[in-house]
Amino acid sequence: MTAADRPLRAALLGVIAVALVLLGGGAAVALGIGRDEAPGADSVDVGFARDMSRHHLQAVEMANLVPERSTDPEIRQLAFDIAETQQNQVGRMQGWLSLWGVAPSGGATMAWMSGPAAGGHAGHDASAADGAPMPGMATDEELAALRGLSGTEFDVEFLRLMIRHHQGGAEMAQYGAEHAQEAAVRNLADSMAQTQAAETTTMTRMLTARGGTPLPAP
């Protein structure tokens, strides 16, 4: 495990703990799951929940850097919204995984995706290692550089990384919306796709206003 993975693991463990408390209270209905037959470990539903949880947790990690490094009210509000929304969604996805009786992580990264949407990026095929980088995710070096910035420089780089991060998650969300067997999973994935598309438009406007240019799309 790299140093950059530790905050993600800690956040994930916290989310799983909350999910288990919910499940102890009979939260299948609250989680939106009503099927008797749980999705299998190699299903789109499980793969989506696992990979999108990890993808989301990096966005939460980046958003949590904002309060100490930015004084821009618009950036701070954006980061708060991203952190709250995506942490909540991770809780739902981890709750599903617990309910289905599968591990919260595992399997080849993005092996649950197939076809053109999956083939365009390294790490989408079935041979990709568990924990391999997903499209749009920041590298350890990029995160380290972001932590060293403040003020407008931080704001610009935060927007650049978050725009690319959202773009990378869009294909996963769209694929989940179209191919998951559980209606609750399809609905959440569709909501993610729409919300992140709108946020990407907003962040691109904010970046331009601050004199920045987007990173190449993943």
Could you say what each language-model-derived stretch is?
Residues 2-218:
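All-alpha RGS (Regulator of G-protein Signaling) helical domain and cognate RGS-like helical scaffolds
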